[in-house]
């Protein structure tokens, strides 16, 4: 493994050289995430940055897609050779067409001949991606998103923004520019749970903020990026020394200002120019930005305040989303809401991962919210049935009831988003989730269909519905009746 590669943010590469023993071969193997799903006859683009470090003027590598469970004739079912013809770094690519469908293929690269080869940024992607984009997204997964007709798309997530520590927080500037020059980062969830340990689960940033903005545009949703406020995950970092001091927040605040410029700036600006170079000269017209995720305590508003001042001064039309903490009620929640009003946040993010009984009791939750303060963003929610960790109909029904509450109070609850959105059937952080997938297929849940119903058939006016002079809310002994019109 070498560390003087051609990309300053991603300098590591591997050198393959001939083994001394004639019966041995030098190579690399990548099994993907629970295998690599490929389909017979479809095209897959293999690419690699490579050079010859010494010796002759050409070298050759053999690229294989392999069924590791078979030692018969179909053991390798897609084979290509790539000739490396330069001592300077170049990108090489070849199209591979598997002769069989295999949900758990393995990619292998072998050195052929006696000349050493340096390899960097090895990639294998379907040619047939969403919108046909090179290194693009899986069509079936994005189509499910588009079919939801979403109004808002929050990215890159919640706790991943904070990081296990500040060093591993999500830094958007590392996720834009050429894909090969985006540095690897630890994934927030790869060892958090002892019963689900994925030591190779890292972020390559191949899906970065540019791709998120582009995806938002293509599915018709307003982008809502979330940035670090200088607090690492507070669940894992009790000591304030793990966080950025308020007086040292300037680089974090500048990141927020630069992101707005990247999304909306003219092509003559530094970050607007980069957006144009990546293929999108027109602005993305971003309207919202979130600062912090599930932060709590006085340390959060004292860090949020300078962000708000700076963003208001430079971009007064951008709406700022603050946080009400990780809980839907209690001391932290009750402390942060008045603070968000004091700071004049535009929206306050509330999160609800609660049991069925909680959702059943929320019919009147927003009836008495202050209409003069910040609006509500129900940024993460899902009904977690006790002892029923998978998606089930009763949970979806109660989520629908909660959405009726939101719809009836649309003057105060401006946005909502179910979470988590996607989960792989063999590697998930928790359950339930809206869309499940494996290496070949994807599956809608009952919660998905509820979200689709409400997003497709949006109301335009709320009519007051009463019984004996009281709003019909499902609360106050009304036996769980939820109504909206």
PLM region descriptions:
Residues 40-42, 461-485:
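Surface beta-strand/loop "capping" patches
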Residues 112, 155-160, 228-230, 291-296, ...:
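Active-site beta-loop-alpha junctions enriched in small/polar residues
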């Amino acid at each position: 493994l070498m560390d003087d590669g051609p990309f300053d943010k991603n300098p590591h590469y591997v050198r393959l050289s001939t083994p001394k023993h004639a019966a041995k071969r030098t190579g690399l193997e990548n099994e993907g995430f629970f295998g690599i799903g490929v389909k017979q006859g479809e095209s897959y683009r293999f690419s690699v940055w490579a050079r010859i470090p010494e010796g002759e003027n050409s070298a050759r590598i053999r690229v294989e897609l392999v069924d590791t469970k078979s030692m018969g004739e179909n053991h390798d079912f897609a084979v290509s050779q790539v000739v490396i013809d330069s001592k300077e770094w170049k990108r090489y690519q070849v199209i591979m067409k598997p002769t069989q469908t295999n949900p758990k293929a393995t990619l292998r690269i072998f050195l052929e001949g006696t000349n050493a080869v340096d390899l960097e940024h090895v990639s294998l992607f379907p040619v047939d991606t969403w919108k046909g984009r090179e290194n693009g997204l899986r069509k079936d997964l994005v189509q499910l998103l588009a079919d939801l007709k979403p109004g808002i798309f929050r990215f890159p997530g919640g706790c991943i923004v904070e990081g296990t520590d500040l060093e591993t927080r999500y830094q958007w500037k590392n996720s834009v520019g050429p894909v090969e020059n985006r540095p690897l980062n630890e994934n927030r969830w790869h060892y958090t749970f002892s019963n689900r340990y994925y030591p190779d689960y890292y972020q390559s940033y191949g899906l970065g903020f540019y791709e998120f903005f582009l995806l938002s545009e293509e599915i018709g949703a307003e982008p809502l990026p979330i940035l670090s406020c200088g607090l690492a995950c507070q669940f894992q970092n009790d000591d304030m020394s793990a966080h950025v001091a308020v007086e040292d927040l300037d680089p974090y605040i500048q990141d927020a200002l630069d992101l707005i410029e990247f999304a909306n700036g003219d092509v003559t600006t530094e970050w607007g120019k980069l957006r144009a170079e990546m293929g999108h000269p027109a602005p993305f017209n971003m309207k919202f930005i979130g600062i912090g995720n599930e932060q709590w305590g006085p340390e959060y508003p004292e860090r949020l305040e300078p962000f708000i001042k700076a963003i208001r001064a430079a971009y007064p039309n951008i709406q700022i989303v603050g946080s009400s903490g990780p809980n839907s009620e209690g001391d932290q929640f009750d402390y942060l809401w008045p603070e968000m009003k004091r700071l004049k946040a535009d929206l306050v993010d509330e999160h609800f991962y609660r049991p069925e009984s909680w959702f059943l009791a929320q019919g009147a939750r927003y009836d008495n919210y202050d209409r003069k303060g910040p609006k509500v963003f129900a940024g993460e929610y899902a009904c977690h049935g006790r002892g029923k960790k998978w998606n089930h109909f009763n949970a979806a029904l109660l989520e629908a009831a909660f959405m009726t509450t939101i719809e009836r109070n649309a003057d105060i609850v401006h946005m909502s988003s179910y979470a988590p959105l996607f989960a792989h059937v063999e590697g998930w952080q928790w359950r339930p989730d809206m869309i499940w997938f494996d290496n070949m297929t994807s599956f809608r849940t009952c919660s998905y269909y509820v979200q689709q119903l409400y997003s497709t058939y949006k109301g335009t006016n709320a009519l007051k519905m009463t019984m004996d002079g009281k709003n019909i809310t499902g609360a106050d002994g009304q036996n769980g009746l939820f109504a909206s019109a």
